Amino acid sequence: MKFNISNLKAVFAVAALGAASCTANYEDINRNPYEVTGEEMERDGYAMRSFMTTMQSWVVPTDRNQCQFTDVLLGGPYGGYITDANNGFNAGKFSTYDPQSNWSPVFYRVIYTNEMSNFSELCKVTEDENAIAVAKVVKVAGVHRVSDTYGPIPYTQVGTGANPVPLDSEKEVFKAMFADLDAAIEVLTRNRAGMISTDADRVYGGNLERWGRLANSLKLRLAMRIVYTDFTTEDGRTPQQLAEEAVASELGVIADNAGNAMYMGFGKDGNPFYVCFFSFKSGEGDHRIAADITSFMNGYADPRRASYFNEATFSGGGYVGLRNGIRIPDDERINRYSRYNVTASTSLMWMNASEVAFLRAEG
């Protein structure tokens, strides 16, 4: 019996040694040899560049399907600029105020989650204050659109470990966005002659001074949106004071087209608006220009029409928009209406000098 027990102990000892030797290299054995590690991702700032460019690609979504939901099917009709021109959209759409249930959360899901999650990850992989300042501007550029659409959203407690993350009121979101912009403006002004990697920037090619002007311009935009409210920041500044600060800032605001914030960098399909107007539906496009905007511009004989629209192919030509919310007719007729003047290589506009000029005039 003693002999058997001794042998049994020996067996267990060998098994224990074998188990230890197996688990000692467990992570290495189970690591995909064709996949980069976290350490490799951080070399040469690759991870920062990846998170930054991803954030930039979601301010106005560059994915054609997501952009169609957020800016063409939703923003286009409600703004009076774009209408649906595919009779597959004859039921359950934003332009008739009865969107399908799975359409309503898309704007929140694709823009908000991509901006906030990638910002959090970027802050984990870099301590570069310039990169973080630019990322704050990008975050506000994307997320303020989400708050404008839905109102309260999680913002101030994202990344704190709270589960679930509580909603902030729209007032609290605006306070936090102004704080983010102020922090970014301070860094970008102080380091205005500096750069971030051009590979991390598809808007201004790494130019910090231009990012500072965009930050001030966004601050002006947000201030003017709440100028007739009782809003104040944590330190008591009113929207009027915030707007005046932005314009009087050392870097100033976007003042000419050279400073326009325009995203440049698409996949093989090109500009997503081009895809929506010229590629979907066998090349005829799912959308046309809305009658709202063409009626105004035709009424004033606005000289910008040729830059904004393509002429209709009706016998009389001209710029003819399609009414929003109607029952969409057959393709033969619908395809004659004016389309957006956009090409596959046209840059995506975030903010431009003309908007800033109007904001300044309103103030």
Label every model-predicted segment.
Residues 1-20:
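Sec-dependent bacterial lipoprotein signal peptides
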Residues 4, 13, 69-70, 238:
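Terminal low-complexity, poorly structured segments
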Residues 3-6, 24-27, 179:
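Intrinsic-disorder/low-complexity regions
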